[in-house]
C-alpha cells in the first residue's frame, strides 16, 4: 500500500471489516502484510520558497503503524518492510508470520491494487502464488483477508471475477472466499476473506 493513501475512507472500510472479522472469529491478533511502497510527498510552497513537508506531520497522518494504537482487545502487528523486491519480501513476510503463529490470527494482505491482472503484474499487485503461500501457512480457524481495489473503469462487474480468482489461487473449495464491503463508505474497494478449515 502507498503511505500516501493511509487513513482515507478506504481505511475506514478496511479496518472496520478486519476488526469485525477478528471479533466474530475470536481472534486475538490482526497481522497486516502491508506491501509498503513509500511515497515521495510533494513540497510546500511558502511565499515562493519550496520546502519539505515536515516529517512530524507526515508521520502523524501517514504512518501505517499508527493502526497498532487502535483501542481494542486486539493486537495489531504491521509488517512494514518496503516492498521493492518480490522474492525477498515474500520470504521476509513468511518469516514474520511464523514468528506470530502462537496465537489465532487474521492475516491481511494489503497491496496497492489487489490480485495480479492477466497481463503485466507489478508491485501494485500480489501474485496468485504469493497469496496461496500465505494461505497455506494458516492454521485451522485462522482468517485470511485480502484488499482488492476496483479493477476496471468500464463499469463492468469486477468483484465476483476477482473473488473467484482468489479462491482458485488459494486452491480453496467453491464458496470459501467471502466479501466484506460497504458501497456507502468506499464503493471501489472490497475485502475478501476466508476462514481456514
Model-based region annotation:
Residues 1-197:
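Class I S-adenosyl-L-methionine-dependent methyltransferase catalytic core
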